[in-house]
Amino acid sequence: MNQRHFIQFRDLPLLYGRVPKVANSSIKACLYRLLTTSPEKGLRTTSDAFWSKGTHGETSMVDNHSARMCRGTHFSFSFVRNPFDRLVSAYNNKILELDDVPGPMQAMGLKHGMAFSAFLECIATTSDADLDVHLLPQSNILCLDGQLIPSFIGRLETMESDWQQLQRRLRQERLPTLGNLPEKNRRRGDDHSDVVQYFEDSGLVHLVADRYDNDLKLFYSDIDLDHLSRGLLN
């Protein structure tokens, strides 16, 4: 599994902790605007390879240790998502929509069209080291030794207001703002009504609550578990 979760800019004191299934493609499209030279052809901005190899050295992908070492000199940000909703999104996108399940998920034992309950049970019994990054706890991506690395964390559920707050923080840090957030790879949109249908079984709710306990405590401790498992954050 790729351990380099942060995009670091060479000429700007800026880091982005990328979390798959959390507007990652849209945010990368905004970061693309900060590049000063035309990138190499053949790589999509959505891929980590673009940021590690395709920008003529303007950006690199760094691990959590390197990202934390930059806390005193760089502004870092990221966005998180309700773990229940993130799992439903990953299941729909990677297990139901794709005929060929991605290799790392196949290695976990995940298969096209498998039942949602079996999908969750497989995740619950797979170690963090063997999880596909789309299923990795967000706290693993954004923390080191239990300490949060980014200085700004927004939520997908309040993306519009949090994105504006991020722009204000960037201006305060004397960094270029990122402009409007484009809609990229949004399949379910803002409709999270299907979350409750997937989590009608309280056993599945508790399975996810146990597996993603750190995410819930760190990013969503102010919201009741029942509301989260129904996709309700208000």
Region roles according to the model:
Residues 1-234:
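Membrane-interface amphipathic segments in extracytoplasmic regions
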